[in-house]
Amino acid sequence: MSKMDKLAKFEKFDLFFAAIACICGILKVMEMGKEGYPTLGTVSKNGMAVLAVLVALGFLLKYADQMCRRITSHSFSEKGGFLNPCVILSVIEFFMMLICIKAMLFYPAEIPGVDDSSQMEPPISSKFGLFGAIFMPYIFAECIRLLLANKNSRRDRVILGILVLGCLAMAGLAYLEYKGKGNFISAGILGVGLSMLLSRLALVDEDEEDTLLDDSAEGGNVWMYLAMFASFTLVLILLARSHRILFDNLSFLDSLKSFTFLGRKVSQMASEDPPKDPLPRQEGGGGDTIA
């Protein structure tokens, strides 16, 4: 099997699961918008959980294949080696993928708040939306790649259409979560996805020739590095902000541990350990108590 055949195999894998993600996401939005469909909610939730594992495996295989092809290329050293923007981009994509998988699997769904009768703020919701975790690394990879290789094929337009559907589904989920729970994290991730989508739209041209990743980018182009750095920084700011909200009741060291895949116990501590009561309990009868 040639390298072209292997690459096409990975591309079909990504397209297939991206399409399923859109369908499951739309089902989830429908279930959230119309209460009384527990079966639909169960199907969408379980389907997206299984899909998350498959997508993660697909990303791992894809990036491993890309890195192997670049490192073993005869022109690897001539194009800057590990300082080549495309190689740096692959490392950033891999890092972002791990962070998104970590957020999707290990972050607690909610942090317990005070009782509603206390008229305090409602529980802080930390749901990113499974589609945000699934689509964000894919949008990041595809759109920033276009900043490095100014070539687009018919396949790229198909991917662009899937990204549009994914962003529309993310928009529905983000709106419902913000309206019902005041959750701005999903809206922030949606903003990242839309900004990347606009970058991709600005780079679409009429070239329909199927091409591989363009590794011929010159290492001296400062704009390439600035584009990668700006996008990477924007995503990290959103993740850091949401992480601060989730683990506000933990020590600094425990918060650092929670960033790793070994920090699942720390994440569970954040979701199981309720915050201190803002008001003292009233002992004896004749008054309401804060649970």
UniProtKB/Swiss-Prot annotation:
Glycosylated residues, chain numbering: 249
- Full protein name: Uncharacterized membrane protein ECU08_0540
Per the UniProt record, the source organism is Encephalitozoon cuniculi (strain GB-M1)
- Write down the membrane topology: Multi-pass membrane protein
**GO CC terms in record:** membrane
| Intracellular or extracellular location(s) | Membrane
Q: Transmembrane: present as a keyword of the record? A: yes
Q: Does the keyword Cytoplasm apply?
A: no
Q: Which parts of this chain are annotated as the region Disordered?
A: 269-291
Which residue spans traverse the membrane? 13-33, 40-60, 81-101, 128-148, 158-178, 220-240
Disulfide bond positions: none
Principal localization reads membrane
Instruction: List keywords of the entry alphabetically.
Output: Glycoprotein, Membrane, Transmembrane, Transmembrane helix
